[in-house]
């Protein structure tokens, strides 16, 4: 069908791009040529279409219309105006790549100081259903530097689009959807409509952002060029964007260091560079990175005695600046100790949401590392007071919101930790009974665990909780027929659930609004990974491959390139603040507690494959997450918010519970209560359950410390990566006379994982030396035992 003249699409393009444009300047479709062929980029229609000028000033939001002004075979220019502001939008090629150049001029007599003014990109980031979401580009990273901008969008199937501007951009924002309405009140949804690049924006903005892009003076014109470049792999991004931005791009393998450790930062730059370093103790220094090849420099970053953050600002000869943050941490046990203290300050409570009593994980697991009779008694008193309010003591049935089967499975996990902390077999018996209730009431014939008809196998990992129970039951089952029968029953249930996950191949549901959901994907991967590790080598294949496929797709939701030790490895979650800490509207919570679900997944992936890439991700993410404990004050925070500017409201008057004999239910919409408005931007958010009594879920932060206990406490790692380099975590390694000497650098290390191939090794535990003649990847215990598979014990 031929379109009417007024709606006919404008076809433009260059050697590496093709676009179809509407006459209002918005993109109907865009194709970019990558090394692997053409990549289709979908664009939104309606209110979120783009590219389009959007702004907010004088208390009103504005969408500025533009119309076609001129065109040629390579591009088109659109122009429009609003009051004294004249706007233009040009599509064209820069070095063969797709580019959008936007300009605005103030023809008036007074300054224009908008709250925001920029381009809504219109790129379709709306991940609604399977399998469509596999072809949507999620805005994985958007980063303003003082002199330029860069970032990328990524699909679950692996394609990337780099986004770069050689000009400074004040800010950015994601357009979050509305999930559902409660009368006239909006609850934030689980999808991102698209995103906006705010060329001008009012403060306050994060210190790294340009600070003087808040106004347009009379007679002034400003112009920005945005380039979109397709990539096959993330490791191509920084090298390629450096010349586009004409700025240094900073690459860090390790974003957190223990005291005394060092890391090498690679700087991609077409010009020579200098670096200014601000140390945690306040000292400043200027250093000269060393040339390491064409367009590449290296800077060695050494952690001193002071814990906190090292800020590195790199500047090239043209004055372009980029910033990195490397965290310097105390030992891992310090974080667990502080989290335990916080779990009694913000105590677990009986509610309809297991997130409210997640602190029990930390309280019980820390008892194994810091035995303390008084704190254990307090923990047991909490458990004794809240458990009967949530579960029937005889039937083990949940007493409220029975469809939230994650409440049941999470309590199974807590009771396993209680058993391991106290040796009380009654705790494991109760966990076993709860598991039986879950299996009989929530497992469907296809093997999945469900809440009603909704697939719940991957909502707070119920199968992993059962696997934790199974691992605890194994020792008892060796000499007890009753426990053996329970072990067999629970193992069979988990196998059915994992077989169903393999068969589903990503076509699964989640709690709340369906999307390519951070936790749904990471929990699927981690459960499949752990189950694979519990199988003999020749039976792992289907579970391992399914776990890795999901985990690799999940990279589009993970912060794997950001040079920031506060955020590295964090997953891009954005609807939890409204439930956990009574803050609205939506904003990224990254890291949030559920980031640690990916950390389990990458750890299991490393143990399954030996690929150091996964171990590096694991340790970087773990270190970012445990920094929810403030390394200066020791206080526990809830999450980190990377959004640069969010006008938010939070409940500011204490919500009091009148009847402590009942478990609390439901959520609390911010606007139903007295609240206060303030601006949030690239910062930590504190916990609030120390002064609010109502059902809030900020205790979910304790997932980080549950993960810490499983992945890193009492463990050290030595591995040889694909380049032949020796990599260590929680230990040092030095070769002398043909023997690799490994010395733990963390307290209470009892296991060392050696991924070295054929090698003679001597491990220097606190209790003595253990020598081993390695032929394969193994764990070495401090008692001298060599273990090939940690979750099988062989």
PLM features per residue range, with description:
Residues 134-215, 272-274, 281-287, 760-763, ...:
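Trp/Gly-enriched beta-strand surface patches
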Residues 234-263, 271-272, 307, 472-485, ...:
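Terminal, non-catalytic domain-edge segments
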Residues 274-334:
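Extended acidic/polar, glycine-enriched regions
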Residues 214-232, 788-790:
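Short Pro-Gly-centered flexible turn/kink motifs
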Residues 1-101, 105-180, 185, 225, ...:
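Beta-strand-rich N-terminal accessory domains
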Residues 329-596, 603, 607, 612-625, ...:
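Catalytic cores of extracellular degradative/oxidative enzymes
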Residues 108-118, 237-238, 274-277, 751-754:
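Short, hydrophobic/aromatic beta-strand segments
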Residues 127-131, 238-260, 322-352:
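Low-complexity, Pro/Ser/Thr- and charge-rich linker/hinge segments at domain boundaries
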């Amino acid at each position: 069908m031929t379109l009417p003249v007024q709606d006919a699409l404008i076809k433009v393009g260059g050697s590496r791009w093709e676009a179809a444009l509407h006459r209002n300047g918005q993109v109907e479709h865009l194709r970019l040529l990558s090394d692997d062929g053409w990549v289709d980029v979908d664009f939104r229609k309606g209110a979120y279409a783009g590219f389009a000028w959007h702004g907010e000033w004088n208390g009103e939001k504005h969408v500025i219309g533009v119309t076609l002004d001129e065109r040629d075979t390579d591009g088109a220019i659109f122009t429009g105006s609003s009051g004294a502001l004249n706007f233009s939008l040009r599509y064209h090629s820069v070095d063969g790549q797709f580019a959008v150049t936007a300009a605005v001029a103030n023809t008036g007599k007074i300054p224009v100081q908008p709250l925001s003014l920029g381009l809504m990109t219109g790129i379709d980031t709306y991940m609604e259903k399977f399998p469509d979401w596999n072809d949507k580009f999620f805005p994985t990273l958007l980063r303003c530097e003082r002199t330029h901008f860069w970032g990328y969008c990524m699909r679950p199937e692996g394609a990337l689009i780099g986004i770069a501007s050689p000009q400074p951009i004040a800010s950015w924002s994601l357009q979050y959807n509305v999930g559902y309405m409660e009368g006239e009140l909006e609850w934030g949804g689980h999808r991102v409509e698209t995103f906006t690049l705010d060329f001008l924006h009012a403060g306050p903005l994060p210190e790294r952002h340009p600070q003087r892009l808040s106004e347009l003076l009379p007679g002034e014109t400003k112009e920005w060029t945005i380039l979109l470049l397709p990539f096959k792999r993330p490791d191509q991004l920084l090298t390629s964007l450096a010349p586009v931005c004409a700025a240094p791009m900073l690459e860090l393998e390790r974003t957190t260091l223990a005291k005394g450790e060092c890391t090498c930062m690679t700087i991609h730059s077409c010009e020579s560079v200098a670096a200014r370093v601000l140390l945690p103790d306040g000292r400043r220094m200027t250093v000269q990175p060393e040339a390491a090849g064409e367009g590449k420099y290296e800077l060695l970053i050494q952690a001193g005695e002071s814990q906190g953050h090292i800020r590195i600002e790199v500047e090239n000869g043209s004055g372009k600046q980029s910033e990195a943050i490397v965290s310097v941490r105390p030992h891992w046990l310090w974080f667990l100790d502080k989290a335990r203290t916080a779990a009694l300050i913000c105590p677990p409570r009986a509610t309809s949401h297991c997130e409210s009593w997640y602190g029990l994980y930390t309280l019980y697991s820390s008892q194994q590392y810091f035995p303390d009779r008084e704190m254990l008694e307090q923990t047991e008193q909490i458990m004794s007071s809240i458990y009967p309010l949530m579960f029937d003591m005889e039937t083990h049935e949940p007493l409220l919101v029975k469809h939230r089967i994650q409440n049941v499975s999470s309590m199974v996990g807590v009771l396993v930790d209680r058993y391991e902390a106290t040796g009380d077999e009654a705790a494991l018996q109760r966990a076993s009974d709860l598991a039986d209730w879950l299996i009989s009431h929530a497992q469907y014939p296809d093997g999945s665990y469900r809440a009603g008809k909704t697939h719940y196998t991957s909502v707070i990992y119920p199968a992993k909780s059962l696997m934790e129970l199974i691992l605890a039951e194994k020792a008892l089952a060796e000499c007890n027929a009753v426990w053996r029968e329970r072990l067999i029953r629970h193992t069979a249930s988990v196998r059915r659930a994992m077989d169903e996950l393999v068969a589903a191949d990503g076509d699964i549901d989640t709690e709340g609004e369906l999307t390519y959901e951070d936790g749904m994907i990471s929990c699927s991967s981690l459960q499949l990974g752990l189950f694979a590790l519990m199988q003999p080598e020749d039976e792992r294949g289907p579970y391992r491959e399914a776990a890795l496929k999901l985990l690799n797709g999940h990279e589009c939701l993970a912060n794997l390139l950001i040079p920031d030790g506060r955020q590295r490895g964090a997953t891009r979650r954005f609807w939890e603040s409204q439930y956990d800490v009574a803050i609205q509207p939506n904003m990224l919570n990254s890291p949030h507690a559920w980031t640690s679900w990916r950390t389990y997944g990458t750890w299991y992936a490393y143990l399954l494959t030996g690929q150091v890439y996964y171990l590096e991700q694991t340790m970087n993410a773990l270190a970012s997450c445990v920094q929810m404990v403030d390394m200066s004050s020791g206080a526990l925070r809830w999450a980190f918010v990377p959004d640069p500017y969010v006008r938010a409201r939070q409940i500011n008057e204490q919500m009091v519970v009148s009847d402590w004999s009942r478990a609390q239910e439901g959520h609390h919409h911010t606007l139903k209560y007295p609240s206060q408005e303030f601006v949030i931007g690239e910062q930590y958010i504190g916990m609030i359950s120390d002064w609010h009594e109502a059902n809030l879920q900020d205790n979910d932060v304790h997932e980080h410390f549950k993960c810490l206990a499983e992945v890193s406490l009492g463990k050290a790692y030595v591995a040889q990566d694909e380049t032949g380099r020796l990599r260590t975590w929680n230990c040092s390694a030095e070769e002398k006379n043909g023997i690799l000497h490994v010395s733990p650098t963390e307290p209470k290390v009892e296991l060392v994982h050696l991924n070295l191939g054929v090698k003679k090794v001597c491990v220097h535990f606190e209790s003595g030396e253990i020598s081993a003649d390695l032929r394969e990847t193994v764990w070495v215990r401090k008692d001298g035992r060599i273990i090939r598979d940690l979750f099988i014990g062989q």
